[in-house]
Curated annotation (Swiss-Prot):
Protein role: Cell wall formation. Catalyzes the transfer of a GlcNAc subunit on undecaprenyl-pyrophosphoryl-MurNAc-pentapeptide (lipid intermediate I) to form undecaprenyl-pyrophosphoryl-MurNAc-(pentapeptide)GlcNAc (lipid intermediate II).
A biological process term (GO) from this entry: cell division
Organism: Prochlorococcus marinus (strain SARG / CCMP1375 / SS120)
Compartment(s) of residence: Cell inner membrane
Name of the molecule in the record: UDP-N-acetylglucosamine--N-acetylmuramyl-(pentapeptide) pyrophosphoryl-undecaprenol N-acetylglucosamine transferase
Pathway(s) annotated for this protein in UniProt: Cell wall biogenesis; peptidoglycan biosynthesis
Main localization of the protein described in the UniProt heading: membrane
Length: 357
């Protein structure tokens, strides 16, 4: 029986790819999960995977706190070594982030294989530092290989949930009508700044008759906007059906969201999170824009004005409820998104894992 330890923690961009792979592995695999206390994985990872949590954080702190974080990392490494031996783990799979550091180091000290998946176009710090110790580094976006020349890289694409490969109905709570449907997504970390920009653009959107679904994230207060063509939710599990029936998205530029838009061939206006580590969301957005798949609007004092103008340019001159014209910008963006998609990413990663057990 193959025994796999998955180390994935923090944001949806780390957790959802790992979950997507885990759910499609053969039932004969014994899967354990390594996470961090009070992080998103404690809510999302099914109970069928034995979850172990350990305190670990980044080393970017200063002063005494940096030494405290280093001590936590050392203790975490020893704990993962103990976990690997106790559970007789044969392979470790990680999606980067803080939890990847003790998982990778412990794996090498125990002499077992470790596979890392890097989703972003600009690799995270742990990937850049420890990727060379991994047996393979699977890439969500090919451009990431430029920063990982000492690593054994392979392009797999970004795994997405199996439900995205199915035809899903439009959620019943979405406003009904033939007018274009615009979906706003802030990502697992929420997006207070993005939400503000969108709310300031809403009067124009609703005046034009467009339908708007706004997924705000849990860290923002609900608005007081009441309109038949507007629905606001902090979270929904019906994202596949929502995106498959949408005409345009407005979103942060996380790698997970980009992969879902690509699978759905959904044009998007990207508003990169300005405080993302190493500005990786800016890099993700720029990569999507190279394919003509996205427009980029930055979150700054002019952001709302620029967002409204972008929406006007995309929507005002053509009604998306009719078929796309070949020369429409939205149609060109849809084609660009299709080129960005790697639809067999899940199977590519599973094939790699199966080679190492």
């Amino acid at each position: 029986m193959p025994r796999l330890l998955i180390a994935a923690s923090g944001t949806g961009g780390h957790i959802f790819p790992a979950l997507s792979v885990a759910e499609e592995l053969p039932e004969s695999w014994d899967i354990s999960w390594l996470g961090v206390p009070e992080r998103l994985e404690n809510q999302l990872v099914p109970t069928k995977y034995d979850m172990t949590v350990i305190p670990v954080g980044g080393l970017q702190s200063k002063g005494l706190r940096k030494y405290f974080q280093l001590l936590k990392l050392i203790l975490a490494i020893f704990f993962v070594i103990y976990l690997i031996k106790r559970k007789q783990i044969k392979l470790v799979f990680t999606t980067g982030g803080y939890i990847a550091a003790p998982a990778i180091i412990a794996s090498k000290l125990c002499g077992i294989n470790v596979i890392l998946h890097e989703s972003n176009s600009y690799p995270g710090k742990v990937t850049r530092l420890l990727g060379k110790f991994c047996d393979e580094v699977a890439l969500g976006l090919p451009i990431a290989a430029e920063k990982l020349k000492r690593c054994r890289t392979i392009v797999t694409g970004m795994p997405v949930r199996k439900s995205f490969s199915l035809k899903n109905p439009l959620p019943i709570w979405v406003p009904k009508g033939l007018e274009p449907l615009i979906v706003v997504m802030g990502g697992s970390q929420g997006a207070v700044g993005l939400n503000r920009m969108v709310r300031e653009s809403l009067p124009w959107l609703l005046k034009q008759g467009y339908r708007v679904v706004h997924i705000t994230g849990k860290y923002d207060k609900p608005s007081n906007i009441n309109h038949k063509n507007f629905v606001e939710k902090s979270f929904t599990e019906e994202i596949p059906g929502l995106l498959q029936h949408a005409d345009l998205a407005i979103s942060r530029a996380g790698a997970g969201a980009l992969s879902e838009f690509a699978i759905c061939s959904l044009p998007v206006i990207l508003v990169p999170y300005p405080y993302s580590s190493d500005h990786h969301q800016d890099a993700n957005a720029a990569y999507a824009a190279q394919f003509g798949a996205a427009l980029i609007v930055h979150e700054d004092r002019l952001g709302t004005h620029v967002l409204t103008r972008a929406l006007e340019n995309l929507l005002a001159t053509n009604r998306m409820s009719s078929k796309y014209k070949s020369d429409d910008l939205l149609n060109k963006m849809r084609i660009g998104m299709t080129k960005l998609a790697i639809k067999d990413a899940n199977q590519r990663l599973i094939s790699i894992l199966q080679r190492y057990v």
